[in-house]
Design a protein with these regions (language model features):
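Signal peptide processing junction and immediate N-terminal pro/mature segment
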Residues: 17-29
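An acidic-aromatic
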Residues: 25, 85-147, 213-220
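Flexible, processing/modification-adjacent segments and terminal tails
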Residues: 26-46, 53, 115-180, 185, ...
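Gly/Pro-enriched, hydrophobic low-complexity segments
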Residues: 39, 63, 113-114, 123, ...
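N-terminal mature ectodomain segment of secretory-pathway/periplasmic proteins
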Residues: 30, 36-121
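Bacterial N-terminal signal peptides
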Residues: 7-17
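Positively charged n-region of N-terminal signal peptides that target proteins for export
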Residues: 1-4
Length: 266
């Protein structure tokens, strides 16, 4: 699992996130080592990856509950909601709202636009011609992670299982209103769980990550809903039109210092 959740979206240029989580998401891959994943865990996750990989267009919603640990040691939980639309190979849309968050990301095959409505700003960067390449560029160049990006790649398992050390099936449990295979995986800096629907549509229904890099081991939980594998998407969904309330800013690569600076250009 490399970048499965929304935690770091826009954080490099608009808002801070817990240092341990950000470091975990941008760290280099661990040295290659054969993962100890049982067949009972491997089969459901591979079925899910194959199912998602075979879909050119789909949408889903997510409820995200994230624990944050304050310097005092106190833990608080924030709740957010995300709507995501994918049109392979070169279109991606997401909108996240909720506690301390109102953000939008639009990828049209040529550029990625990221807007923060709370702060009244947006940025546009040139992007490669595929979703996979665009997400890699954002992560490597800007430290920005697309929402639930592991599940959006053309081959989800290629990134989802990166750095996994062990994997097992906990049992058959319910998540998101569906009967699922409940899977548990470990990595050096995180434990994570995945609920995959036991059906002809092996969709991810829930993800929970425990961050072992941060004091108190905070958790990040995402429950999926409203999967639509044959959506009729609006023609203008992947065209960003900034409102008058938004001011364009410059997004600078990580190597150039501060990620964002205010700008007056349109």
């Amino acid at each position: 699992m490399r970048r499965i959740l929304w935690t770091a979206v826009l954080c490099a240029w608009l808002a801070a996130v817990p240092a341990g989580r950000a470091a975990a998401q941008t760290a280099a891959a661990e040295p290659a080592k054969a993962a100890d994943i049982t067949p009972e865990a491997k089969a459901p996750v591979e079925a899910m990856c194959a199912f998602l990989a075979g879909k050119k267009t789909f949408t889903f919603s997510v409820e995200i509950n994230e624990e944050q640990v304050y310097p005092s040691g106190q833990t608080v939980q924030l709740t957010r909601f995300a709507d995501v639309a994918v049109k392979r190979p070169d279109k991606l849309y997401s909108r996240v709202t909720g506690d301390e968050r109102d953000r939008e990301m639009v990828y049209d095959g040529k550029t990625v636009t990221m807007a923060d409505y709370d702060r009244g700003v947006y940025a546009v960067v040139d992007a490669p011609p595929t979703i996979d390449a665009a997400m890699e560029m954002l992560a490597d160049k800007y430290g920005i992670v697309a929402p639930l990006s592991d599940l959006l790649y053309a081959d989800p398992c290629k990134t989802l299982l990166t750095n996994v050390r062990t994997g097992d099936c906990v049992g058959v449990h319910t998540a998101g209103g569906a009967v699922c295979d409940h899977l548990a995986f470990t990595q050096k800096n995180a434990d994570w769980q995945l609920w995959v629907e036991k059906d002809k549509t092996p969709l991810p229904r829930k993800v929970v990550i425990t961050d072992k890099n941060v004091m108190g081991w905070p958790q990040y939980a995402a429950v999926f809903s409203d999967w639509n594998m044959t959506p009729k998407l609006p023609a203008d969904l992947f065209t960003f039109k900034p409102g008058k309330e938004l001011r364009r800013i410059e997004l600078k690569p990580l190597a150039e210092g501060p990620a964002a600076q205010g700008g007056g250009h349109e």
